[in-house]
A protein has these predicted regions:
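Bacterial Sec-type N-terminal signal peptides, specifically the leucine/valine-rich hydrophobic h-region
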Residues: 14-19
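Bacterial lipoprotein signal-peptidase II cleavage site
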Residues: 21-33
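An extracytoplasmic/periplasmic, membrane-proximal ligand-sensing/linker region
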Residues: 39-52, 57-64, 68, 240, ...
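Bilobed "Venus flytrap"/periplasmic-binding protein-like clamshell domains
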Residues: 50-74, 86, 109, 133-200, ...
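Beta->alpha turn/N-cap motifs
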Residues: 53-55, 85-89, 99-118, 126-127, ...
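A local structural motif
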Residues: 75-84, 100, 178-192, 228-230, ...
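Short beta-strand->loop
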Residues: 121-132, 187-188, 222-239
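A bilobed periplasmic-binding-protein/Venus flytrap-type ligand-binding module shared by bacterial periplasmic
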Residues: 137-148, 240-254
Length: 311
């Protein structure tokens, strides 16, 4: 079920996404009666399922949302699911490679390196209400009264970016700039540590422009902390397929199938809080994905000579 999110021209534009990954806040959701402690449960290796989440938003906000999803998943699998929002994008790849995670949600480019370095296998992703693979876009915004009209005007200016290696918060914006002849050294890039922080830097007048992707835009607008009418978007990327949820490669095939089936049969209501952070509102049931759905990201990483060191 390969999706054509990237036209040939869009692929060239998108040819510079960057990775995503993991970090540190852990929480165990759901300890169903009759889990692994009551006997052998092939769906419950080690007595719990460790589920890593990339830190694309404040962990204090992400954890409760993923706990809802994890609780529903734990009931279907009869096994507690432990949610861990990792500290940074590279940490999740390392955690899966070292066998510290059973499942991991990676950013699109992060999945490239999770696949190559940890053998992560994609299971599902987030679907729209019409049951299609959802997507999001990177963007660069300026204040409404800014004299900057296009990204070509950013030469010599300051730009707030998210985390190093972020698909939409780092690599895509820099690739867009490169496309108009602006090298990294031609402007001041401020890595703020995350998407919300980049938005805040623009809002507080600390930079001339900031990366704001459609997910962060939806979250901040919904929370009433950002008014888009006070700002302008001067650049946007091609659509990016949303994050895949992956499984460790050495998991038992029966476990992989059980987890995939459980995700696919989750009620959209159990996905809704996570979907809101991913700009998938309202969400549909989760949808099966394969490596083919993210092939443009693999092509991009190769074209840009990106490695896991770019995380």
């Amino acid at each position: 079920m390969k999706k054509s999110f990237f036209t040939s021209s869009a692929l060239a534009l998108v040819a510079a996404l960057a990775l995503s990954a993991c970090g540190g806040t852990a929480n165990s959701a759901g300890t169903p009666a009759g889990s692994a402690s009551s006997g052998i449960n092939a769906n419950c290796p080690g007595g719990e399922i460790k589920f890593g989440i990339e830190p694309y938003e404040d962990p204090a906000k992400l954890t409760p949302a993923y706990d809802v999803l994890a609780t529903a998943l734990s009931k279907k699998l009869n096994c507690p699911v432990k949610v861990q929002v990792v500290e940074d994008y590279s940490a999740e790849v390392l955690a899966m490679r070292n066998g510290k995670l059973d499942l991991g949600e990676f950013g699109p480019l992060g999945f490239v390196f999770a696949s190559q370095k940890a053998g992560a296998e994609p299971l599902v992703s987030f679907a729209t209400s019409d049951k299609k693979l959802s997507s999001y876009s990177a963007g660069i915004w300026v204040a409404k009264d800014s004299p900057l009209k296009t990204i070509a005007d950013l030469k010599g200016k300051s730009l707030a970016l998210g985390s190093v290696g972020s698909t939409s918060g780092d690599v895509l914006p820099r690739f867009g700039l490169r496309g108009v002849g602006i090298a990294d050294a031609d402007l001041k890039m401020d890595y703020t540590g995350g998407h919300p922080e980049a938005l805040l830097a623009l809002k507080n007048g600390k930079v001339d422009a900031a990366e704001i992707n459609t997910q962060t835009l939806a979250t901040a607008t919904g929370a009433g902390t950002f008014n888009p009418s006070d700002y302008r978007r001067i650049w946007t990327s091609a659509p990016i397929p949303n994050d895949p949820i992956t499984v460790r490669p050495d998991a038992d095939p029966a476990f992989k199938k059980a987890v995939k089936d459980a995700f696919l049969t989750l009620d959209p209501a159990d996905i809704a809080k996570v979907g809101a952070f991913l700009d998938v509102t309202p969400p549909g049931p989760m949808i099966a994905v394969s490596k083919d759905d993210y092939q443009p990201l693999f092509d991009l990483a190769k074209t840009m000579n990106l490695t896991e060191k770019n995380l």
